[in-house]
Curated annotation (Swiss-Prot):
SUPFAM superfamilies: Homeodomain-like. Residues 20-80 form the HTH myb-type domain. Residues 129-149 are annotated as: Coiled coil. This is Myb family transcription factor PHL11. It is found in: Nucleus. Keywords: Coiled coil, DNA-binding, Nucleus, Transcription, Transcription regulation. Residues 77-98 are annotated as: Disordered. One of its GO terms (biological process) is regulation of DNA-templated transcription. PANTHER family: MYB FAMILY TRANSCRIPTION FACTOR PHL11.
Length: 280
């Protein structure tokens, strides 16, 4: 078997020298390999290049598909191995840099706080303890809110009872006479309209009254007043009733009213008038 005579660079006069061997050996020189790499790069890389396309692009006589197939396969394997090595080296570098960064952070944390190492050792218990602490705090706040609500409710109930007792005492202290269900309704209406009767409406209704305020008992510090109204005759014939000392008559059913005569230390005296008859 005869070998290919490469001459100086593996090819002579633009082509590879031929032999009678169907599978002649070829020494891939640096120049020949560079031309192969240029052809593969022009075709889009080793994955896209084919032996036939490389053969046409190189255009060397004596270069067969057998030579290009084997060389292209070796070239692809070499590129894959190079990529793998680059990936492994890059991963090692990334791992080393991350380890160094973590080491620096951990050392800085320990230098700032000596208890960091204990927390790192008990890292499994830290989240559970933190959650328990938050839960206990939430329960305490909830209990405090319940206590505040209970106190407010008790105060509201006490105020309601106090108002009810005041209304009952006021109702008992007022003489209602032969009061029935209608009198009770009038009493409730009177409680609602009491402030209005004491206000400007009372002044308009009693526009004909003459008020005379004078000081009685000059040496005494307490002031007494007397209101005298115009007297009119009672047309209905109702008897004049003088209420007991210390009470004011507020019966809404009576046709005649009462004027306040004297309010001293020992009681209240009133006299009837017919303002109610005029208003009715």
């Amino acid at each position: 078997m005869e070998r290919v005579n490469l001459g100086g660079l593996g090819y002579d006069n633009g082509g590879v020298m031929m032999t009678r061997d169907p599978k002649p050996r070829l020494r891939w020189t640096a120049d020949l390999h560079d031309r192969f790499v240029d052809a593969v790069a022009k075709l889009g890389g080793a994955d896209k290049a084919t032996p036939k396309s490389v053969l046409k692009l190189m255009g060397l006589k004596g270069l067969t598909l057998y030579h290009l197939k084997s060389h292209l396969q070796k070239y692809r394997l070499g590129q894959q191995q190079g990529k793998k090595q680059n990936r492994t080296e890059q991963n090692k570098e990334n791992a080393g840099s991350s380890y160094v960064h973590f080491d620096n952070c951990s050392q800085g944390g320990i230098s700032n706080d000596s208890r960091f190492d204990n927390h790192q050792r008990q890292s499994g218990n830290v989240p559970f303890a933190e959650a328990m602490r938050h839960q206990v705090d939430a329960q305490q706040r909830f209990q405090e809110q319940l206590e505040v609500q209970k106190k407010l409710q008790m105060r509201m109930e006490a105020q309601g009872k106090y108002l009810l007792t005041l209304l009952e005492k006021a109702q008992k202290s007022l003489p209602c006479g032969n009061a029935g269900e209608t009198d009770k309704g009038q009493f409730s209406d009177f409680n609602l309209a009491l402030s209005g009767l004491v206000g400007s409406d009372r002044k308009n209704e009693k526009a004909g009254l003459v008020t005379d305020i004078s000081h009685l008992n000059g040496g005494d510090s307490s002031q007494e007043f007397r209101l005298c109204g115009e007297q009119e005759k009672i047309e209905t014939g109702d008897a004049c009733v003088k209420p007991e000392s210390g009470f004011v008559h507020f019966d809404l059913n009576s046709k005649s009213g009462y004027d306040l005569l004297n309010c001293g230390k020992y009681g209240i005296e009133v006299k009837p008038n017919v303002i109610g008859d005029r208003l009715q």
